[in-house]
Amino acid sequence: VNGAAYAGLCAYMFLLILVGFPVNFLTLYVTLEHKKLRTPLNYILLNLAVADLFMVLGGFTTTMYTSAHGYFVLGRLGCNVEGFFATLGGEIALWSLVVLAVERWIVVCKPISNFRFTEEHAIMGLGFNWVMASACAVPPLVGWSRYIPEGMQCSCGINYYTRSEGFNNESLVMKMLICHFLIPLFVIFFCYGRMLCAVKEAAAAQQESETTQRAEREVSRMVVIMVISFLVCWLPYASVAWYIFCNQGSEFGPVFMTLPAFFAKSASIYNPLIYICMNKHSRHCMI
């Protein structure tokens, strides 16, 4: 790999930091500054911003530094730290999206009568979020698989590449695929799918008034953007990781894993734009 590729990665990470930090920090600041935004639902949105800041400060800065050097210069400890923060931040963000999807489904579709999303429910959602994220990020630190430099050796991730006797890589990869990708994806599709159906049913029952038509358009737009952003960010990375895992021993170019891994990092920019900037109250407070 020539030096221009590493320079490109370094510039890309700098761009993510340049955009990701202020957008997520502004999200935190505005929500904490304005009392009307401190609602139970926004606790989850704040958690999303915290997760993105974890990725920016704990992962992106390290990756930019190592990209500038052309390899991972920070040793085993640095690899563990970078891999942990990147994985934890990504998983917190992912499970925040799941909690948001479940909350929206319960509120809009009303499968539980007279349910009101309270501060206690939000705290429970945050606790569940951190438990699931930690269940993914901590095992490689304690011997269940491990974090290793991947792709162009500028960032670290869980070892999909080898079986590594004694580290049980296979079981962790299967756990990650099922528990930390397929199940969240199913939940998100289910919740927003049911939400869209509920809006359509309400529109039909009310003979499609202007209000319900507008609500349907807003929900549809939110569903499409949410699903596309999730798939765009994570499906390439998950697919390539699974392909490499299923073809261990084969030769793969360093760019093969680098591109989807670095592309997935762009989720730190998409999240606040979708879940905060599309909220008119948050947007007005920011202005």
From Swiss-Prot:
Site (Plays an important role in the conformation switch to the active conformation) location in chain: E82
Membrane topology of the entry: Multi-pass membrane protein
Transmembrane stretches, start-end: 6-30, 43-65, 80-102, 122-142, 172-193, 222-243, 256-277
Cytoplasmic topological domain residue ranges: 31-42, 103-121, 194-221, 278-287
Gene Ontology terms describing biological process: absorption of visible light; G protein-coupled opsin signaling pathway; visual perception
Main localization category: membrane
Motif, 'Ionic lock' involved in activated form stabilization: chain positions: 103-105
Ranges per topology, Extracellular: 1-5, 66-79, 143-171, 244-255
SUPFAM superfamilies documented for this protein: Family A G protein-coupled receptor-like
Positions annotated as glycosylated: N169
Annotated positions of the N6-(retinylidene)lysine modification: K265
GO molecular function, one term: G protein-coupled photoreceptor activity
Recorded superkingdom: Eukaryota
PTM characteristics: Phosphorylated on some or all of the serine and threonine residues present in the C-terminal region.
Cross-referenced PROSITE patterns: G_PROTEIN_RECEP_F1_1 (PS00237), G_PROTEIN_RECEP_F1_2 (PS50262), OPSIN (PS00238)
Record localization: Membrane; Cell projection, Cilium, Photoreceptor outer segment
Main function: Photoreceptor required for image-forming vision at low light intensity. While most salt water fish species use retinal as chromophore, most freshwater fish use 3-dehydroretinal, or a mixture of retinal and 3-dehydroretinal. Light-induced isomerization of 11-cis to all-trans retinal triggers a conformational change that activates signaling via G-proteins. Subsequent receptor phosphorylation mediates displacement of the bound G-protein alpha subunit by arrestin and terminates signaling.
Family named by the database record: Belongs to the G-protein coupled receptor 1 family. Opsin subfamily.
Matching PANTHER family: OPSIN
Protein name as catalogued: Rhodopsin
Species in which this protein is naturally found: Taurulus bubalis
